[in-house]
């Protein structure tokens, strides 16, 4: 039997509503709650090298910028990804 995986894209797809400006505290809270909920794959935003880094937004130029936001947070067994 195939295993079903749950992917959450709130921090990426939700950005179409607020121009990816969730605020740093909200980004961390959403991330931590989704990890606690046990999602298998968590999309943390868009990578767009035309954008400058802003820790309040989930659209960022590089994976190093994503690591500045999420790198020290507990990821459990969740795979962390971003859309290009």
Residue ranges, per PLM feature:
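Short, well-ordered coil/turn segments that N-cap beta-strands
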Residues: 1-4, 38-40, 74-80
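Amphipathic, alpha-helical segments enriched in basic
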Residues: 2-9, 17, 44
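Active-site mouth loops of central-metabolism enzymes
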Residues: 9-29, 78-84
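Glycine-rich, proline-tolerant flexible connector loops at the mouths of alpha/beta enzymes
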Residues: 40-68
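Active-site cofactor/substrate anionic-group-binding motifs, chiefly glycine-
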Residues: 62-84
